[in-house]
């Protein structure tokens, strides 16, 4: 079934929704849909069944017929991704969205081959588009925000402004816990786990100096042996979400 992202929040069943210009054009000119065809609508919080009532490039409309069961996990998992080589970040944005990431933070780290540059805003737009399409294809109710790429220092500053219950750092050296054990350890002393940050380094991994800086954030930091996008899947498994 075709899915469309709405520009407004949906209040409930029976409401008629006007799609934005881009989605309207996609429905009419690319997919060539017709009134009466079933679709699904995503408003950033929920996913709804709907039926098209009017199809045109100027404004496609759909009437909401049912609220779908939420496909989203109970916790929000934010992916801090050390800048990888070339276009690898595009694949990461796609797969992270499919695996349920809430946000994606590209971060320049000491071992990053790719560096911040003047075309970063265009890259962000491209990554946001990839996340949008991946969310639609995978049936997400939420489209992850892809933040603009920042330096390691600015990412640390962001953590001061945006608190997390738990920060999991993928660490390939010794003394790292299996991710499932890290989550279990946290839940032994906390009732809820609402917001998690998963820190993944670039291809060369996370530098020791960066590990030490992250460690200063306190006891909510746990080093895990799970690296890459496997960390997202492992998190949901540990929380009983898969």
Give the ranges of each region predicted by the language model:
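N-terminal positively charged helical leader segments and presequences
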Residues: 1-69
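Fold-independent oxyanion-binding glycine-rich loops
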Residues: 7-8, 21-22, 44, 83, ...
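Short, glycine- and charge-enriched coil/turn segments that flank and shape catalytic ligand pockets
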Residues: 9-16, 54-59, 67, 71, ...
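A generic structural signal for short beta-strands and their flanking turns/coil linkers
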Residues: 13-15, 35-37, 46-48, 58-60, ...
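Short glycine/serine/threonine-biased micro-segments
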Residues: 30, 34, 137, 199-203, ...
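RNA substrate-binding interface of SAM-dependent RNA methyltransferases
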Residues: 69-168
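Active-site/ligand-binding-proximal alpha/beta "capping" segment
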Residues: 162, 167-211, 215-220
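Structured adenosyl-cofactor binding patch, chiefly the S-adenosyl-L-methionine
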Residues: 204-242
């Amino acid at each position: 079934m075709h899915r469309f992202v709405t520009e407004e929040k949906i209040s409930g069943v029976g409401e008629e929704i006007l799609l934005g210009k881009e989605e309207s054009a996609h429905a009419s000119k690319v997919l060539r849909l017709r009134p009466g065809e079933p679709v699904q609508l995503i408003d950033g919080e929920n996913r709804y069944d709907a039926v098209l009532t009017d199809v045109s490039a100027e404004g496609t409309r759909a009437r909401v017929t049912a609220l779908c069961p939420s496909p989203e996990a109970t916790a929000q998992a934010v992916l801090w991704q050390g800048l990888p080589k070339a276009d690898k970040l595009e694949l990461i944005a796609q797969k992270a969205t499919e695996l349920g990431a809430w946000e994606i933070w590209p971060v320049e780290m000491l071992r990053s081959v790719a560096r911040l540059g003047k075309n970063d805003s265009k890259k962000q737009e491209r990554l946001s588009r990839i996340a949008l399409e991946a969310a639609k294809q995978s049936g997400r109710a939420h489209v992850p925000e892809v933040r603009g790429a920042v330096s390691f220092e600015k990412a640390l500053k962001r953590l001061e402004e945006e608190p997390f219950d738990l920060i999991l750092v993928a660490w390939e050296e010794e003394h790292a816990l299996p991710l499932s054990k890290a989550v279990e350890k946290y839940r032994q002393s906390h009732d809820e786990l609402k917001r998690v940050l998963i820190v993944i380094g670039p291809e060369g991994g996370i530098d020791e100096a960066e590990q030490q800086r992250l460690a200063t954030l306190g006891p909510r930091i746990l080093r895990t042996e799970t690296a890459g996008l496997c960390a997202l899947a492992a998190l949901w498994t540990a929380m009983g979400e898969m």
